[in-house]
Each structure stands twice: as structure tokens, then as C-alpha cells.
């Protein structure tokens, strides 16, 4: 029995390269291939240095190999993954999608880590989604949340061409995740590319409308619990201060609101610590991939 599930990384940009470092440390996942389209990319160069087989000939090359991976992690762009996803499924390869394509069900570890382990394709939503949806989920499991709004602010230099090309998909996919996984009746997402120099760490603000008679202590306790869960795979995820409870006003649309401020400091594997927006995506994807790998490996034994 193989002790690890074999993995291919499709994409050789910032996210893929940071993911490579995390997969190298995994007890359940073995990165074997990295696929890109630029033969001179830093990602492919580093992957070769780790002993991975690499190609700049895209998904066609990977699917043309005799040996195929158990899992593929794709960090390209939404339209590229939408085209490749059915081909992975046809080849029997489980896909973890780090683009906003949302071909398969979305996963945020604290909320629904084990809900879709049998799905052929799972989606990691967006960096803003991974950072903020856990907080919405923490509130909605205590009280009804008729509306939630998240604002994700990331260092402009951490946003590569793929992120910039996917801005529209980012807002749509994150808003949907706030509703479907976070539990809000209606959700809205905003991303800000902060041009500050030196670059700012990722910071997120989460607004949740709550009932007038909401148990504030229970909401705060739930938020702290979920933050500790995220910290198990993203140690640099933290509350900036205690959740703030506000009375209805013109500013907040006449709602009782709880506002939560978080920041995400990256592990500094490939990218600087300020790029916590990329780190939380790759860390969450690794966490989900490990759970899928455990299921695959146990099935091979039985």
C-alpha cells in the first residue's frame, strides 16, 4: 500500500509554488509533478529542485502520461480549470480547485471539512473566503444572520496576474460562499488591493447582521472557537481585537451588527509573510487534500 497519495500541481505561479512547500511537509501527500505553461517560471525551477517531474506543456501533457496522480491541485485561472475539470474526472483524478471556477462544491475547513470528501472536484473558494467565511459560520451557528458583508484587503504586490484576472469571479464566488457555507441569508464580498509600500499584511473585516436579542457572549465564544480551529493550519491567523457589537444606525443599515477584524500572516514558505492571502489558500487546500488522501488510502487497503 502506498503511504501517501500522489499529487500533481497544475500552475506554476505564486500560489502553486507556495503550495509545493506545504505539500513537501505533508504526511499524506506526495507531490510528484508540477505543470505550467512558462518553461522559465520560478515555480517549475523550484519543483525540479525538489525532484518533481515538470512540464510547461499544460494539462495535455499530464493527462498523456502513463502514470497519473491520485489528486491534482490546480491554481491557474477560473476559465482554465473549467475546461480541465471534466478531463480530470474522466481520468479518475480527484481535483482540488484553488481558482474561483467553483466547478465542484466549496470547502472551508472549520465549516464543512468532511462534507465533500467523495466529490470528484472541490473548490477552495478564494483567499478572502477562506479568511472570512469561518467567522460568518461562527456567528450563524449561534444566531440567524440575515446579511453578512466581508472586506478583504491584501497587499497589491501579492496579487499576481491570475488574481487580477479573476476579480469578478472573486466577488461572486466569495459572496456565494458567505451564504452557502457561512450561513448568511445574503452575502456580499469586496476585495481591496492595497498598494502600500512596505506591503501590508492581509486584513479582513467581517460584518454580520444579528437579531436584537442575540446572545453576544455566545457569539464571541463561537468566533474564538473557530479562530482557534483555523490557527491549527494557519498559525498566523488571528483576531485583531474582540468582536464589536453595534446598535442599529444609518451607517449599518438599521441592523444590530457584530463586526470582526482579523489578519492573516503567512508562514513565509515561498512568499513573504505579508502574503497571508495566498498562505491561507494553500494551507486550507493542503488540509482538505490530506483528508481526501486519508479516505483514498484507507479505501485502497480495504
Curated annotation (Swiss-Prot):
Superkingdom of source: Bacteria
Enzyme class: oxidoreductase
Keywords: Aromatic hydrocarbons catabolism, NAD, Oxidoreductase
InterPro entries: Acetaldehyde_dehydrogenase, Acetylaldehyde_DH_C, NAD(P)-bd_dom_sf, Semialdehyde_DH_NAD-bd
One example GO MF annotation: acetaldehyde dehydrogenase (acetylating) activity
Cystine bridges: none
Binding site for NAD(+): 12-15, 158-166, 277
Any single Pfam family the record assigns to this protein: AcetDehyd-dimer
Reactions that this protein is recorded to catalyse: acetaldehyde + NAD(+) + CoA = acetyl-CoA + NADH + H(+)
Active site: 127
UniProt GO BP: catabolic process
Enzyme Commission number, as recorded: 1.2.1.10
Family according to the record: Belongs to the acetaldehyde dehydrogenase family.
HAMAP family found in the cross-reference section: Ac_ald_DH_ac
This protein's name: Acetaldehyde dehydrogenase 1
Organism of origin: Mycobacteroides abscessus (strain ATCC 19977 / DSM 44196 / CCUG 20993 / CIP 104536 / JCM 13569 / NCTC 13031 / TMC 1543 / L948) (Mycobacterium abscessus)
Amino acid at each position: 500500500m502506498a503511504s501517501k497519495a500522489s499529487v500533481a500541481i497544475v500552475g506554476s505561479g505564486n500560489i502553486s509554488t507556495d503550495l509545493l512547500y506545504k505539500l513537501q511537509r505533508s504526511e499524506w501527500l506526495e507531490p510528484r509533478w508540477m505543470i505550467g505553461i512558462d518553461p522559465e517560471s520560478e515555480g517549475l525551477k523550484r519543483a525540479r529542485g525538489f525532484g518533481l517531474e515538470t512540464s510547461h506543456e499544460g494539462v495535455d501533457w499530464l493527462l498523456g502520461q502513463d502514470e497519473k496522480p491520485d489528486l491534482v491541485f490546480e491554481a491557474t485561472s477560473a476559465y482554465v480549470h473549467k475546461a480541465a475539470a471534466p478531463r480530470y474526472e474522466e481520468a479518475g483524478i480527484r481535483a482540488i480547485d484553488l481558482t474561483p471556477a467553483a466547478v465542484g462544491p466549496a470547502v472551508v475547513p472549520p465549516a464543512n471539512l468532511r462534507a465533500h470528501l467523495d466529490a470528484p472536484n472541490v473548490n477552495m473558494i478564494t483567499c478572502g473566503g477562506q479568511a472570512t467565511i469561518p467567522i460568518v459560520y461562527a456567528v450563524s451557528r449561534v444566531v440567524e444572520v440575515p446579511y453578512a458583508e466581508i472586506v478583504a484587503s491584501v497587499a497589491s504586490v501579492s496579487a499576481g496576474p491570475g488574481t487580477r484576472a479573476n476579480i469578478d469571479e472573486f466577488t461572486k464566488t466569495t459572496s456565494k460562499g458567505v451564504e452557502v457555507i457561512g450561513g448568511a441569508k445574503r452575502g456580499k464580498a469586496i476585495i481591496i488591493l492595497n498598494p502600500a509600500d512596505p506591503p501590508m499584511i492581509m486584513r479582513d473585516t467581517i460584518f454580520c447582521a444579528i437579531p436584537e436579542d442575540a446572545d453576544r457572549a455566545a457569539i464571541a465564544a463561537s468566533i474564538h472557537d473557530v479562530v482557534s480551529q483555523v490557527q491549527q493550519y494557519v498559525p498566523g491567523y488571528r483576531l485583531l481585537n474582540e468582536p464589536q457589537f453595534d446598535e442599529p444606525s444609518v451607517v449599518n443599515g438599521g441592523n444590530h451588527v457584530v463586526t470582526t477584524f482579523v489578519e492573516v500572516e503567512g508562514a513565509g514558505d515561498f512568499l513573504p509573510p505579508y502574503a497571508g492571502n495566498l498562505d491561507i489558500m494553500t494551507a486550507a487546500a493542503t488540509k482538505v487534500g490530506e483528508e481526501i488522501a486519508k479516505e483514498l488510502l484507507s479505501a485502497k487497503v480495504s
